[in-house]
């Protein structure tokens, strides 16, 4: 389902993420928000939630001069993104993740949990695929140990577990976390 709003979100994301690549790869970053939107669209046809998935990293990763929270509110009216730290300096990895977990845990928008689940599914899918291809070399692209990365995904899942996120999405994320756990515990 490609509505005018979804098409607008895709255009904005493509422009905002132009020239960016996925961490440690040559894959254009735009693949990630598009994939998150596609994952969400498999479980809901709610336009605002799909748009939120496509735009979910813009406030965190894109210079506000390119696209700001004000622009997002103008273009999409309601707050379509999970809470981000727009315009704030980038904190160390652990502090960023703890802050994200706190904001997500305090969210009362079911859409934020759906977007977070789809985002983590795509991120973990890429991590596991890259691990299969490159082995332990992939951990160097992160500012955290693989044990900390596992901790983070488990913490996100613990927040999502009891929320009304489609059960298939939760199962998918849980299975990916188990795969990551197997890698981390087998090869610490």
What are these regions (language model features)?
Residues 1-188:
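Active-site helical microenvironments for divalent-metal-assisted chemistry
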